[in-house]
Regions:
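Solvent-exposed alpha-helices and their adjacent loops that cap or buttress functional pockets
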Residues: 15, 27, 75, 97-98, ...
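Alpha-helical scaffold segments in soluble metabolic enzymes
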Residues: 8-12, 68, 72, 94, ...
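Small-molecule-sensing regulatory modules
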Residues: 1-76
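Glycine-rich anion-binding loop/nest that anchors nucleotide
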Residues: 17-21, 82, 109, 242-249, ...
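Class I S-adenosyl-L-methionine
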Residues: 77-88, 93-190, 195
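Beta-strand->loop->alpha-helix junctions that form or flank phosphate-binding loops
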Residues: 22-28, 52-53, 126-129, 188, ...
Length: 280
């Protein structure tokens, strides 16, 4: 059974001296087969996987486990990566590593396109281009593309400004990847919600003035019939209110806060292209 599983794995993976692969199976006294396997399709970066199956002494079941692990290893992986707020010095080391190793990079509108210069010469670059009221690819198309490229065995980077889980639709994409059985990893990025104010000299918390800060979308999805923001509660908050992507709706945001009791003299700032040389 062990031998059947190992041979099936190596056959399915196409293991050779050009693309190192290894599989080790162990059948315990209860008829449970445990197998560990690894594969280096690019001859440098090993992928590892393991699996367990109650096979008894049925060699065909061992074959099934070996082939299943091979399929998992030949499938690619997706990294949902935050590129930071725009200043290249604020890009994380892990973000750079992901970009440099990626087979495919699906990227949004970035504050600095020079980050893409870090990609391999043979990497496939696909623009998804999200800006207010204009998406080069619709979200479902982006989701499908991530899954498609990963199933081709590619290492895929989904590159977003800021942090992928702060109004970056990273959560939606992670859900779709999980449902499709695609391995993925979240790579946090510096968010403009605190990076941009910091570069403007504004602390979002301060012992004398703000014991909390609140990050709020300034651009609610078009699928909503109206705002779901509770301006009555927001207006009462002592902490700093940070509205992201709010330039277009700035008059509405300000008027809603004031209408719900926020002092019109409350200190406020509008920051564009924060942390970059174009900040204003």
């Amino acid at each position: 059974v062990e031998l059947c599983a190992e041979r099936a794995f190596l056959k399915a993976i196409g293991g050779s001296c050009n693309a190192p692969a290894a599989g080790l199976a162990h059948l315990d006294e209860n008829g449970v087969l445990q197998m560990d396997a690894l594969f280096a399709p690019d001859q440098k970066h090993y992928r590892r996987v393991s699996g367990t199956l109650e096979t008894g002494f049925d060699g065909d079941k061992g074959v099934c486990l070996g082939e299943e692990l091979a399929e998992k290893l030949m499938q690619g992986k997706v990294w949902l990566v935050g590129a930071g707020p725009g200043n290249m010095d604020l890009v994380t080391q892990k973000c750079l590593r992901c970009i440099r190793q990626a087979d495919v990079i699906i990227y949004d509108s970035l504050a600095t396109d020079s980050l893409l210069n870090e990609a391999r010469m043979d990497a496939e670059l696909i623009y998804a281009g999200k800006r207010a009221d204009h998406h080069h690819l619709r979200q479902w198309e982006t989701n499908a593309l991530l899954i498609e490229k990963a199933k081709e065995g590619k290492n895929v980077v989904r590159l977003k400004g800021g942090d992928p889980f702060i109004f970056g639709r990273g959560g939606e994409e992670a859900q779709e990847l999980r449902a499709a059985g695609i391995e993925y990893e979240i790579v946090c990025g510096v968010s403009s919600c605190y990076g941009a104010p910091a570069y403007a000299g504004i602390p979002v918390t301060h012992r004398d003035h703000a014991s909390s800060f609140h990050v709020i979308t300034g651009h609610e999805g078009n699928h909503k019939s109206g705002t779901v923001l509770d301006y009555a509660t927001l207006a009462k908050e002592e902490g700093t209110l940070v509205f992201l992507m709010g330039l277009k709706n700035l008059p509405s945001i300000a008027s809603n806060l004031i209408a719900n009791g926020k002092d019109p003299k409350t200190p406020a700032a509008v920051i564009q292209e924060g942390t970059t040389a174009r900040q204003r």
